[in-house]
Amino acid sequence: MNTSIKNIAAFTAGLLFVLSSCSGDFLDHKPTDAVDSGIVPVPSNAGRIFNGAWYNLFEYSSTYANIGYRALMLQDDMMADDVVSRPMYGFNSSYQFNDVVMPANNRTAFAWYLMYRTIDNCNTAISITATGDDDTPDFRYSQGQAYALRAFCYLHLAQHYQFTYLKDPAAPAVPLYTEPTVSTTKPKGKATLEELYTQIFKDLNKAKELLKGYVRPDDNSKFKPDVSVVNGLLARACLLTGQWGGAADAALEAAKGYALMTDAKTYMGFNDLS
């Protein structure tokens, strides 16, 4: 009896020690997808806001199968012609096209949450104004990257929630937000495809202007859009709107300075678990 009590006491003391010593260890004290609201308007914070917007695309939501933007890419694979759905495997609802037509489906809600939260973060970065000493190249680069990412998100939404632009530019697509939202912001109705693509081209051209001269400093920054990435997005937007000459020109600009990868370098992009 005494031994049992001693064992319980020892276990309890050990548990309390573990909890007290590491209770805060697992907390992210410097989250990459959030910024203190009190310093959001500061120009020097624009880069952190863009980083938060980007890392938001990796956020899990509602199920282990919603693994950020990668889940939406898998969803597209399932809705295309190259993948066959198997029992007991995720994305069956994508295979049946339920993910884009059923409002109550968790991936439908996830796609809107992921895209519009990222857009809202970009809107916050874009809304910051700078004058004098605050108007630095780094500030302009961060805003350019926010413009590029916002255009990328709207390209995704335009392709998923309406038929092609060439079928009907006046067709309603998705809501268009270009300003940060707050709790009292009234929901917007659907913008037309023409309105959406007008904003997309405007954002990409602005991004191209702001990112002139930007060079990624290291591999840790390769997620940040540069002018080549913006030209790639411009080529995609031109293709989707039937501007074939513009698509070719933008694609050639995007490819400048790059050579085809060797087999060895190509394999370096994959994990080797063995």
Predicted regions mapped to residue ranges:
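Hydrophobic-face positions in mid-chain alpha helices that act as interaction patches
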Residues: S61-G68, N92-Y95, K224, L239-S274
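Short coil/linker segments at helix-helix boundaries
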Residues: H160-E194, T198
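Inward-facing hydrophobic residues that define packing positions of alpha-helical scaffold repeats
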Residues: I119-C122, Y197, L204, A251
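Bacterial N-terminal signal peptides that target proteins for export
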Residues: M1-F11
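Bacterial N-terminal signal peptides
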Residues: F11-S20
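Conserved, well-structured interaction surfaces
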Residues: M88-Y161, A191, E209-L211
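Membrane-proximal, proline-rich intrinsically disordered regions
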Residues: C22-M73, A251
